[in-house]
Amino acid sequence: MVWKHQLIGFSGIFSNVSPASVKVTVGSQVWVEDPDEAWLDGEVVEANGQEIKVNCQTKTVVAKVNAVHPKDPEFPELGVDDMTKLAYLHEPGVLLNLKARYNANEIYTYTGNILIAVNPFKRLPHLYGNEIMEQYKGTDFGELSPHPFAVADSAYRKMINEGVSQAILVSGESGAGKTESTKMLMQYLAYMGGKAESEGRSVEQQVLESNPVLEAFGNAKTVRNNNSSRFGKFVEIQFNHMGRISGAAIRTYLLERSRVCQVSDPERNYHCFYMLCAAPEQETERYQLGKPSTFHYLNQSNCHALDAIDDSKEYLATRKAMDVVGISPEEQDAIFRVVAAILHLGNIEFAKSEESDGAEPKDDKSRFHLKVAAKLFMCDEKALENSLCNRVMVTRGESITKPLDPGSAALSRDALAKIVYSKLFDWLVTKINNSIGQDSSSKYIIGVLDIYGFESFKTNSFEQFCINLTNEKLQQHFNQHVFKMEQEEYTKEEIDWSYIEFIDNQDVLDLIEKKPGGIIALLDEACMFPRSTHDTLAEKLYQTFGSHKRFTKPKLARTDFTICHYAGDVTYQTELFLDKNKDYVVGEHQSLMNSSDCSFVSSLFPKSREESSKSSKFSSIGSQFKQQLQSLLETLNTTEPHYIRCVKPNNVLKPEIFENVNVLHQLRCGGVMEAIRISCAGYPTRKPFNEFLTRFRILAPEATERSFDEVDACKKLLARVDLKGFQIGKTKVFLRAGQMAELDAHRAEVLGHSARIIQRKVITYLSRKKYLLLQSASTEIQAFCRGHIARVQFKATRREAASVRIQKQARTYICQTAFKKLCASAISIQSGLRAMAARVEFQYRTKRKAAIIIQSQIRRCLCRRRYLRTKKAAITTQCGWRVKVAHRELRKLKMAAKETGALQDAKTKLEKEVEELTSCLELEKQMRMELEQVKTQEVEDLRSALNDMKLQLGETQVTKSEEILKLQSALQDMQLEFEELAKELEMTNDLAAENEQLKDLVSSLQRKIDESDSKYEETSKLSEERVKQEVPVIDQGVIIKLEAENQKLKALVSTLEKKIDSLDRKHDVTSSNISDQLKESASSDYEMLSNLAAENERLKALVSSLENENYENDGNDSPNEQKEGPQMLKEEILAEDFSIDDEMTNKLAAENKDLYDLVDLLERKIDETEKKYEEASKLCEERLKQVVDTEKKYEEASRLCEERLKQVVDTETKLIELKTSMQRLEEKVSDMEAEDKILRQQALRNSASRKMSPQKSLDLFVFMYLFQPVENGHHESFAPIPSRRFGAMSFRRSQIEQQPHEFVDVLLKCVSKNVGFSHGKPVAAFTIYKCLIHWKLFEAEKTSVFDRIVPIFGSAIENPEDDSNLAYWLTNTSTLLFLLQRSLKSHSTTGASPKKPPQPTSFFGRMTQGFRSPSSASLSGDVVQQVDARYPALLFKQQLTAYIETIYGIFQENVKRKLAPVLSSCIQGLKDSSHEFSAETLSAESSEQNSPEKPSEENPPEKLSEDNSSGKLSEDYLAAKPSEDNSPAKPSEENSQAKLSEVNPQAKPSAENSLAKPSEENSPTETWQDVIGLLNQLLGTLKKNYVPLFLAQKIFCQTFQDINVQLFNSLLQRECCTFIMGKKVNVWLNELESWCSQATEDFVGSSWDELKNTRQALVLLVTEQKSTITYDDLTTNLCPALSTQQLYRICTLCKIDDHEDQNVSPDVISNLKLLVTDEDEDSRSFLLDNNSSIPFAADEISNSMQEKDFTNVKPAVELADNPNFHFLKE
């Protein structure tokens, strides 16, 4: 025998036609391979060498000649019952035969002696029953239709006649019907075996009833089968010499233990559990059971019941079957008590014990189930708990009890449940065998093997490894048997034959079970070592079998391995191999069960014979299974096998469905195709002589003439066609592979030649006959036609004359009627047009009058507001001037005072003056309050005026005459408005003149400064030496630097003068623009008559916006979403210009005030060089108060014209550097003053020239407070200044205690590193805060600690690529700011809280508001003590706020930078896939060839600014501005989403609904998953660093804004604005929505709403019937958030010429086109812009912090043991 050691693939190896012998011509019927249907039949329509074109029913296929199989044209409709009778024995022939018989409900087919059974998934009563068994009784095999009864009968007859034991092997995959086939076999054998009695019960009845018992405890529902056997079973039925059943034995293999504790959805656990839960009520009460959903071992799956199966009836049937097989009622009760105990055992949950480190039952519910389980097991409850929660380790001389953690206790519980169930099942099998009884004197046996088929799943573990080993063994046995049958066939026919090569899988068996060195041997060896893991096992396997051709290692796996089985490659996961291979029982469980009071339970766990485990021999599941398998094969080798291969026709378990690919795979895995291949290797075609001659006698007719011998005739016939290699047997002709096809080709050639001769003769006869008939008929037809034509012509002539007359009269009547109708229509149209024109004119005049009234009221309000502001500024200037005059008088008095008493009197007078000034300030405050009241009253008046206007608008619709009168009065009001505007222009000119005067004043002051500087230089030279002697601590370098600062400030004054000049120029331009707009307003025409109705609505919106403007007083007009029409636009421009003029006037006034302050400052520098240090300090403090008030006014003005400040950003940035250097100089001077306090005081008392140097320090302090350092380049309102005298403040500063600088280094070294988090709170922020509070640094007037802490926060920006580091410092800085906000209060804060100012709109405004406002965190006083903060602390909080926004901006930019290329790749991938899809399915759609309308008719920029953000902003985070919040989503968005779901119902977040499934590795779906991956990575970074939820929501909102902008702008491109693209993007958006729901709203917030533009655009794109959409539906329901430009572009781009119903109606497009103005020509205003602004304020962070208790935060490890930082533990 020749053994062929090679692996043959599945494709094309079973063909009996070799490529060289295939003869294919045009017209041949062949089979071609197809990936979907396995094989398709068709006709060859073209043959080109080795390639042919085959026309199938559904498509045309081009294939190679050697890749096709011939088709039998004479194939019977119902197929053949034995596939060896097929003319062509190949894969397509086998599939066709099985399918034909399956459709005819003939589910059984022979392949030689092999029976193939196809599961019908329905009842077929005609195939079973006693009458059917009677038919097959004693019938020869193959005489009747194929049936399992025939196989059983053949086995029984051979056993009786030949005296040889038989075996029937039933195999197939789960759900193929193995169990049912086994039942029928046993039923027939019991029928044939008679009725021998054994103890009152028949043996055959016990054998049959053992099936339901074993099914109840060994079968379960799986995904593939509702009654899947989870164990292998071999039933040995013993017969005596009379052929009667004398005994039986059941052997089981490899029960699936893990199913007891772990069930996957939608599978079920073993049937017995559900039967017991459905038992009668008294049974369930006894076992304290309930519904299956209440038990952990059953509720892991949602499937608790099976269709058409009643578990309660099955329970009673099982109990009845137990009675039959000999299980007593007491034993049955014990069995089900154990089953119930297992269920209760699974409900025991464990938690960590409070008394020890071990585990204990979690709650009362767990203890209840523990108690019930102990009761059912009849064991001690405490002992059961200890066995589950403890382990006893036996050492030399003692035993150690080790407590288990909750997880290990749960594993111990599951281990006990599995071993108890396994022991119970083994007991049942043993009991059934003992009950049935085995006959030791039996002569023969018939074994029925019900074994699992070949299995290959996504995850393959130890069970699949053992199952596939079994199938490899059985396949080898099967191959050898089939080969033997083939040899017997050839020997019987007495033909010459050679040995046949067939596949041998011995190498796979050696790989698995060879000892030593096999996989099982290595697995057992690994199990013997306690430290072995699946990693070491896998490594050992790789080292041992790395070069084996049947063993491979997967590329991306570390512990998996792949074995090349006969049915395909299977990859096994080794994670649970070691645990599943170990066959041991936990000692505690063994002792507990053995000590049970129930004899049944204790019998399941008998005492071990060997007390010491060391002396016992190691045993494993793999070794035991191998031994059982070897014993099974030895038994099979002693018997004659019969094979039944069960096939599952489909995976949906439904009848009438036959899946070719699935069936073919099962035939290959079951070895059927291998048997066919072995047959094909010899003589696959075998025809009896009579059939062969009947089919091919036309090839040699002379061989069959008269009387002939069949053998000689066959030889002559084969010699005629020159066929070689055939064999002539006794009754059959044996042909080689391909010879049958060659004979068919010769036969078709002969038949074709004969058919052509017959066709030629018949065609000749028919053509001659037809010609003669046509000749005689044509003669008669011609005569008849000529007469008929003459008659017809006469009638036509008469008819023509009559018709001419009738037409003349008819045309006359039609023309008259049409003319009359036209006249009537013209009159009607003219009257309608005149009426419409009159109505339009009336409505226009009505609206114009209302607009004029509104404008007049607004202008009056604006003028009054300007007047009040001017009055307020004048009062402030007067107060400042009076203060300055009083200061001069005070200086004169001090210069006259020589003695100490005089000085004290002067001081007293000065204090009185200060009190007077204080009263003046109080008076000014009262005036401000009065102004506020006046302002409020004006607002109320304006509201009432607006209400009156609304009433007037309603009254305008009463009569036409009243409206005309109101229009005349409106014209008079317009003239008054023109006069007011002229006055306003005059006032503007006056302001310009005032600016000129201020410039002159500045110039004069500059000259004074120069003179004072020259005098100062001369004086300084004379007193330089004396100053050095008396005040040696003053450094000359400091003086030089201060002089340099003075020069820089001079340059600053000149810069501000230039700024004023530029503002004057802007004022002139504004004035000219106002005049031009007034002229344009007077000469505007009356267009857009069709939009008058819409203008009325827009006018109402304008009134609403004006009300909002008066309420907010911040100059920001609320967006008006429907401003259209030239006339309304001009009126809006006019109102806007008035607002601009107001803003310019306020700006000029504010600049004037600023110049006044600078002038006062310079004049004070000249005067204060002659005063003492303390006197100058007092005067400076008062001046600073005034400057603070003035700067606050300037801040209000700057908010109104914030956009104008962008022009001076560069200059202010340079100013920041100057301020920073000044601050550093001030700190140095302050330190020097503190160190040499005594020397400087003595110098001030004794030196006559002490007025020089101290003045420099004074200048430094003055300018430090005037220009505080800011972070973003904007002017900041002054920091709160202590209310005490400047001199007293200086004295207190000199007296402050020394800070603990020696501990600062330790603190900085600790917090500069990542010290992590404690209870989700940052340790670094908590440590810094506690140290600053403890050291009282917030109350210090001067300290450098804050300057040393700030650079630590700057380290987060040094590495902007490290997102984790940025998130860490973002959490620390925000938490520290929260702590500062709740703890610090401004030193100048009074008890009365002022009225809350409007929310600032700029980055600088938010910072200063957070700087000024007290902490907004609502915390009780006992949590933290309020601290009276000084300037350094407030400045530190300001810098901290700036760092938070800087770090946030960098982090957001990193996210955007990572997300942008991935989104671009996604969009590009969708474009490519959309083009491919469109080329195949949408070739008729050519909408993209039609260019859309020019963008010149899109909406104006004003509309775009209302719908989108306020434009692209600077990426400089320090100067960033907040964007306008997007308008909230309208309720109609929900309707849009609902409509989107209706249009695309399958668009759900699952992989099954994807529109395209590209085969490339870089598919768009994978790229979209990259976006989800980035979002998951971002979410993980935020969670890891405990970023506050408020900031996390802002980050995700801004990220989703960027996604919305990129996706929406892409959809507005021509290639992306398609139906297919919309569906694909919508699928991914559903996945993104699913991700948002999984990420929870706490982190993502309202991020999903940021995609509203893209979602609404997709609604329009994926709507199929776009022609039914109206304009109102489009703008109100479908896409309310999209602008007119965007809607117009989408409607034009998605237009398809050949599908009018899929296009938007032309009326809607024309309406959109009318609304698009000509101003946007060549613009791209339809695109969305990215918004890089900071979307939050400092107070919002503090308000959003949820955690307000930091008492449980642990300090850093480095500081915990330091005694100097013991306060951190308090």
Curated annotation (Swiss-Prot):
One of its GO terms (molecular function) is actin binding. CDD domains: MyosinXI_CBD (cd15475), MYSc_Myo11 (cd01384). InterPro entries: Dilute_dom, IQ_motif_EF-hand-BS, Kinesin_motor_dom_sf, Myosin_head_motor_dom-like, Myosin_N, MyosinXI_CBD, MYSc_Myo11, P-loop_NTPase. Residues 1347-1718 form the Dilute domain. GO terms for cellular component: myosin complex. Keywords: Actin-binding, ATP-binding, Calmodulin-binding, Coiled coil, Motor protein, Myosin, Nucleotide-binding, Repeat. Residues 78-748 form the Myosin motor domain. It holds the Pfam family Myosin_N. Residues 511-545, 547-570, 605-629, 629-651 are annotated as: Actin-binding. Residues 900-1253 form a coiled coil. GO terms for biological process: actin filament organization; actin filament-based movement. Residues 774-803, 799-828, 822-851, 847-876, 870-899 form the IQ domain. ATP binds at residues 172-179, 225-233. Residues 1388-1407, 1477-1566 are annotated as: Disordered. Residues 1494-1506 have a biased composition (Basic and acidic residues). Residues 25-73 form the Myosin N-terminal SH3-like domain. Myosin heavy chain that is required for the cell cycle-regulated transport of various organelles and proteins for their segregation. Functions by binding with its tail domain to receptor proteins on organelles and exerting force with its N-terminal motor domain against actin filaments, thereby transporting its cargo along polarized actin cables. Homodimer. Belongs to the TRAFAC class myosin-kinesin ATPase superfamily. Myosin family. Plant myosin class XI subfamily. IQ domain mediates interaction with calmodulin. This is Myosin-10. It comes from Arabidopsis thaliana (Mouse-ear cress).
